[in-house]
From Swiss-Prot:
The gene is DSP4. It comes from Arabidopsis thaliana. Changing residue 139 to A: Mildly reduces starch binding and glucan phosphatase activity. Its EC number is 3.1.3.-. Residues 97-254 form the Tyrosine-protein phosphatase domain. The lineage of its organism: Eukaryota, Viridiplantae, Streptophyta, Embryophyta, Tracheophyta. This is Phosphoglucan phosphatase DSP4, chloroplastic.
Amino acid sequence: MNCLQNLPRCSVSPLLGFGCIQRDHSSSSSSLKMLISPPIKANDPKSRLVLHAVSESKSSSEMSGVAKDEEKSDEYSQDMTQAMGAVLTYRHELGMNYNFIRPDLIVGSCLQTPEDVDKLRKIGVKTIFCLQQDPDLEYFGVDISSIQAYAKKYSDIQHIRCEIRDFDAFDLRMRLPAVVGTLYKAVKRNGGVTYVHCTAGMGRAPAVALTYMFWVQGYKLMEAHKLLMSKRSCFPKLDAIRNATIDILTGLKRKTVTLTLKDKGFSRVEISGLDIGWGQRIPLTLDKGTGFWILKRELPEGQFEYKYIIDGEWTHNEAEPFIGPNKDGHTNNYAKVVDDPTSVDGTTRERLSSEDPELLEEERSKLIQFLETCSEAEV
């Protein structure tokens, strides 16, 4: 069985033989206190993580660096809140933070120094599963190569990178099958505690952990979500998990969708959203014969929101289906891609698209078979 989505964006640091020398490094000089807001209801979109630190006195140059990190954290938190649709705050300058979701599964923020590897080894972590892309690391100045090199010195821990684009629910959907396949095999191989992280540990990492719990560990989706939210304030994209589940069980079907906008003397028309996320744009082509700007796009099954950008101005097209305004005041167009709803696959998709889908025994077996046969060579 082939993976739905090949995974070239994955790197693995292999475990060494048990005869290698292990080194102990002292912990960071900062004394960190982390306060997390009380657990919230699973359906509360206004999840918030609050961190406080008490550090020893620092030099002026160190304080300058902290100020820059604080500014970057503010910007990142604003972007995250806007993109995720939930009030989320990440303070990179306070160091790595995490929560045990289960005794064998941790969701947390990114490692920042090689010394963080030692901190995780001390709590029994055997697999560090990183979902960050290079731009994520560069933004906060994290040297991933030094962290990977340090982890390779030890026989009892493995560092794995499987990238997912930040703030992109479609990329999450498309990457989940191969990423969770890699995670599944790593857990079987290494045992112990697994540390899943992205940048803040509030979007991609909880989504991957939640999917693993749903597909492999026998949880219903909302049962796993409730447990996750009781341990860590975060905002995983549930629709991406539902769609990735359906993609494996019914096959990844695509259909061509045509979007059109009547020309009114525009110079440039673009679309954002759809399957590319809100941070990217696709230009439309003007058909002078019909007087319409046109975009043809192959999309998998599901509902995709989008917006037009006409000569730099964001708007929606009232001649196409639209929804809103949403809680942020935005009105978006949407394209709904469906196969035959009366078919067996159509019935399965409808059932698993519900608020709290429950996998049948044979469906979970099929998912695990997929994860087992999605070979390392493909990822």
